[in-house]
């Protein structure tokens, strides 16, 4: 229950952080799409641990293996299974957590729900679960590019009180990947890196905001009323580990405007297309894409597992303290960028197929 996502382009992820491996089964991918392990690996390398001095030191190659659904570099239209083997586990680092709950982590709630949990690495609550999402997202991105020319670019917008000034209309993947913190603001990125390093030395952690833009999204995607495009985007992004907030377009800032200030005025461009002069709606109106760029923001809390000693209780309710061992990100934001991109791609891909199925007959 709860490990599958999507309707026509549907994924199911599997595996635990310290188990044999993690992965995904993708059902509904159209046949004859050219895809390679190298294309999937590119996205996984952006997500993998140990990639820089500001991420977890856990060393995993995260090498993907396509088990089914692809032959001679083309999809068959049958389920695609992708697996990544776990290699660098240190389960002994979690011995104290057999009985002591990590504050603000899923330990206590998993115990409350299931009466059992995978202590080492956090099991399914670990961010290693997102390997399957990112792998599936690589295929969804390729499909969106091939069918509609959609481009998806995510980046770190904010860490703590440091906020980058980035234009979602023009930002490129190359700019994002030019810095280990994945903030393409050249003035702010070094400050973010210094802040993450400093807080890591203290045994603490930081949160922030990832912004993501999807360009050239076709009009008409979204299924009112309960499957509005922004509703599905919110669900997708909020299902990622450590997420605590979602905005689209002007978001909460729109509450400070009047209707005349917030409304996006229509006009007809030189190609005869109906466009909007501003994009405070963030690319959707009435739950349906309007052809403008879709711009979302996702808030991530500070990493829950930290080395600083904290008050907590045991699974029997006794007061204790916990200074967590293990290898954890002092800030999840740099590695969260490809995760957000993947979830946006999965939603858009699913809705594109749904739109084709329902509304392209005549």
Swiss-Prot record:
GO cellular component, one term: cytosol
Gene3D superfamilies: Chorismate synthase AroC
GO MF entries: chorismate synthase activity; FMN binding
Pfam families tied to this protein: Chorismate_synt
Cofactors named for this entry: FMNH2
Any GO BP annotation: chorismate biosynthetic process
EC number: 4.2.3.5
Catalytic activity: 5-O-(1-carboxyvinyl)-3-phosphoshikimate = chorismate + phosphate
Recorded metabolic or biological pathway in which this protein acts: Metabolic intermediate biosynthesis; chorismate biosynthesis; chorismate from D-erythrose 4-phosphate and phosphoenolpyruvate: step 7/7
Record's keyword terms, sorted: Amino-acid biosynthesis, Aromatic amino acid biosynthesis, FAD, Flavoprotein, FMN, Lyase, NADP
Binding site for NADP(+): 47
CDD domains hit by this protein: Chorismate_synthase (cd07304)
Keyword DNA-binding: no
Residue positions binding FMN: 124-126, 286, 301-305, 327
Keyword Flavoprotein listed: yes
Superkingdom, natural source: Bacteria
Cofactor comment text: Reduced FMN (FMNH(2)).
Its biological purpose: This reaction introduces a second double bond into the aromatic ring system.
Record family assignment: Belongs to the chorismate synthase family.
Complex and partners: Homotetramer.
Protein name: Chorismate synthase
